[in-house]
């Protein structure tokens, strides 16, 4: 049975280094003679690989995950652990903008205002998933594993101030805030504090 392995790309070089030998790329684009060429991903492909990444992490962490058909509230997925929930807006890029201490992403102001709203029932977060420039290197298949070349970073937007721009606002995603199972636990800790500010009923 094949196992799923999630690996990351280098922060300074988004082009991932992949296993060689018997490894076979599942997703690939070829010229007429069969020679592989780099392929730019469409928006729906980026969206789906982002969801796959979060699904894998939430499953390992034992969290329930809900996909929303429409993100009119600025939310793509909601995680749940018992009575607590975490809302996440997912973004994916093949060419991340690197800044000091992490990454920067221009989020539309409408979504930003929804996620930062202090009256939300669940804290809002932005997650930025980074994939290799060549879609043919996103997924590779070995005899014992399927490797997903994707890694992510996150930022909590709950309760932040007004946007710096009128159309988009730059969101800083710290390098140390990688999107992992442990990070999801941190998000739920914040959700508990938000719903129980005095610590009532929290173990």
Regions found by a protein language model. Give the residues of each.
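Mixed-charge (Asp/Glu-Lys/Arg
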Residues: 1-73, 78-203
């Amino acid at each position: 049975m094949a196992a799923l392995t999630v690996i990351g790309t280098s922060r300074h070089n988004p082009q991932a280094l992949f296993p060689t030998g018997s490894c076979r790329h599942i997703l690939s684009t070829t010229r007429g003679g069969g020679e592989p060429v780099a392929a730019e991903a469409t928006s729906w492909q980026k969206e789906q690989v982002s969801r796959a990444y979060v699904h894998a992490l939430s499953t390992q962490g034992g969290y329930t995950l809900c996909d929303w058909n429409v993100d009119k509230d600025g939310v793509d997925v909601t995680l749940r652990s018992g009575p607590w929930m975490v809302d996440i807006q997912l973004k994916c890029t093949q060419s991340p903008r690197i800044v000091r201490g992490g990454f920067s992403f221009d989020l539309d102001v409408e979504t930003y205002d929804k996620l930062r709203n202090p009256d939300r029932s669940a804290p809002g977060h932005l997650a930025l998933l980074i994939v290799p420039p060549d879609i043919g290197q996103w997924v590779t298949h070995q005899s014992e594993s399927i490797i997903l070349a994707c890694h992510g970073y996150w930022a909590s937007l709950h309760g932040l101030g007004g946007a710096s721009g009128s159309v988009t606002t730059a969101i800083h995603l710290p390098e140390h805030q990688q999107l992992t199972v442990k990070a999801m636990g941190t998000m739920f800790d914040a959700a508990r504090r938000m719903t129980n500010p005095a610590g009532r009923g929290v173990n």
